Amino acid sequence: MSNTGASLKGLLLAVLLVSNMLLTKEGVTSLPICSSGSVNCQVSLGELFDRAVRLSHYIHFLSSEIFNEFDERYAQGRGFITKAVNGCHTSSLTTPEDKEQTQQIHHEELLNLILGVLRSWNDPLIHLASEVQRIKEAPDTILWKAVEIEEQNKRLLEGMEKIVGRIHSGDAGNEVFSQWDGLPSLQLADEDSRLFAFYNLLHCLRRDSHKIDNYLKVLKCRLIHDNNC
């Protein structure tokens, strides 16, 4: 086996081991999930929300970790933060900025908004997980977090589709999501420009994962606990 193949195999193994430990610690893996096509599934809406909230919190944790590590390793002294304001591909989606604004939105609209943001990240996360491997001397901790975030975003999206289907009696919503066209920026020959593209993407990921985490907590409180939390 080549060194590259062995390295990739080792990285994937590390992803599986570490993600299993972290998910178990967060309590995500302990929650029951209905398999696709299950009949008379007994998982309650509350349990589905529990799992979604824990999973979104885990994704935000990883997003913050990977951003902070990238910032410390590659962005110091480059002035990236001043250029990253309002540069997210999801900025076209109208999203509440704080808890007070979030509470003013009807739950159906908020659910569709969460679906829209999650689906807006499908494509960029796939390419982030592959392109980050091309960064010079990228540490394994950044590599496996990129792979893990992509996988867990898929799981959260699947969970949210179950929740929306339960609330809307099978309708997964007609949400609008933002297309991402940033792949060429992640492949630029100029190192500073390429690193800024990664920095900006990770900055936006941290921002959006935080929003989703907060939106889900508001929805859980409203729909499961009748705002008594």
Swiss-Prot record:
Coiled coil: none
Cell compartment(s), UniProt: Secreted
Molecular functions (GO terms): cytokine activity; hormone activity
Signal peptide interval: 1-30
Post-translational modifications: Three forms are found, non-glycosylated, glycosylated and one form seems to be only O-glycosylated.
GO biological process: estrogen biosynthetic process; negative regulation of endothelial cell proliferation; photoperiodism; positive regulation of canonical NF-kappaB signal transduction; positive regulation of cell population proliferation; positive regulation of miRNA transcription; positive regulation of receptor signaling pathway via JAK-STAT; prolactin secretion
GO cellular component, one term: extracellular space
Entry similarity comment: Belongs to the somatotropin/prolactin family.
Protein name per the record: Prolactin
UniProt organism field: Meleagris gallopavo
